[in-house]
Amino acid sequence: MSGSQDLNDSIRIYNEQLAQVEQALEGTSSGPERESLINLKSDLEELVKLTLETVQHENGDDLNAAASGSNEDDEFALFMREINALDDPGSVDAKPPKPDEVSVDEQEPFKDLVGSKCSAPHIHKWGSKSYHNALICSLDASDLDDVAAKVLFINPTHQEMVPCAYFLEGDCKFNDEMCRFSHGELISINELKEYREPRFELLRKKGCKVLAKNRNRIWSKGTIQTADFETKTCKIQMDEGRHEVELQFENVLPLEGDDVPSSDSESNSDSDEENEDDVVSLQQAQIIERSLLNPAPDQRLGDWEKHTKGIGSKIMLKMGYVVGAGLGSKGEGIVVPVSAQVLPQGRSLDYCMQLREQANGDKNLFSVEKKLQREKRIQEKRDAKNYAANKSKKDVFNFLNSEIFGSSNGSSSSSGSKKPAAKDNQMDLPSCSSKNLNIASLKLSEQMRRLELDIDRLSHSLTRHQPGSKMHSNLQKQIAEKRREISEIKKTEYSISREQQLRNDKRKMTVF
């Protein structure tokens, strides 16, 4: 009775734990924690059920023992039959002795396996053997030397492997041999292997082989086209029919190199290569995912190579480096390049630390890159300021470029509108230096010489065309325009020479 009392105490403890788990489930909304609580609840319920069966079994054995002890006549008759069987070995009534029944304590270590997942073998009709994920639903521990487990396959690939829905509900009218579906397969516990968790990260690779659940509950082979890890859905192209379906991750089983169903035409080398490709793609996907969690750096690693051929970055990319990730095979190294620091010359480290403290701990205080950027910004501002000053400044060269040299592209009508501007610009001649006036006078003389040569060339061409023709008229217009430009240049030369004469007279008067 002490064993039954211990089991009753265990049942009470299990019920208290089950109540605590249900209370925790009410306060948990979703996520992996809720899934673990649901699994724990199912395990506790299964444990309570098994413990109750054990208590009932022990109570039944005690009652049978009491009944057999009270009936002495039956025991005496049984004893006499056994004596007669020993005296007459050839007697028809002789029966072999029953094997010793396995005690409940010896079966106890195997009861924890009920409800657990494993990888169990299945022998197909054509004789091939393959392992599939399965669930242990019961155990046959009558012989401790050969304990058998009844399993139901989680991802059945053929009809004889699909669990019978009516059998699970207890309503199937057929026995194990007559039913088209599976009532569970008895497999030696020594042949079971560890359960393989689905590796959904393999779905990131396009072309990954998977088993997909059909409407008839049979899992068929397919190929991944796209996968969305936010909605937990993926598009699969089935090998049979070549049609595409969209399924949740829970209805998909990614196949690794060892899980792909083998055939006579497939070789082991192909599966090994696919497994290696999956490992490489998985590592690269993990590196990319880790790089997305890093903050965006201010400077790209290898940014200095824009001034070179960039051979270093090309070599790193061929070696598997992912842009934006850290250095190293797993992308756990530095992302931001080490910045060069230039400390003040002839100063101690204490003085440099004091300067950094005064700058509120600025890490870029002695950075070479930051210093070059500051100098670049200062130079850009200085250049912009000088450009604005030069643009607003009016001298004789601006006057020549805008009024004299630029008038060759204008028409006679535009020349009339430029005359007032020329008069205004002539008022700026006193602000020009004597050197600039001399250079401007030289340029005007050179421009006048070129215009006179153009007039001679056009006049020579004019003699080759008949008067009144279109070409003759165009040449006359060009000659008139050149002469007008010469007239403008002469006026400007006169203004410059007059300004120079005024300066000479003023200098002489000053000396006098």
From Swiss-Prot:
It is found in: Nucleus. The keyword Plastid does not apply. Residues 407-417 have a biased composition (Low complexity). InterPro entries: G_patch_dom, Znf_CCCH. Residues 256-279 have a biased composition (Acidic residues). A zinc finger (C3H1-type) spans 159-186. Pfam families: G-patch. Keywords: DNA-binding, Metal-binding, Nucleus, Repressor, Transcription, Transcription regulation, Zinc, Zinc-finger. It comes from the Eukaryota. Transcription repressor. This is Zinc finger CCCH-type with G patch domain-containing protein. It comes from Aedes aegypti (Yellowfever mosquito).
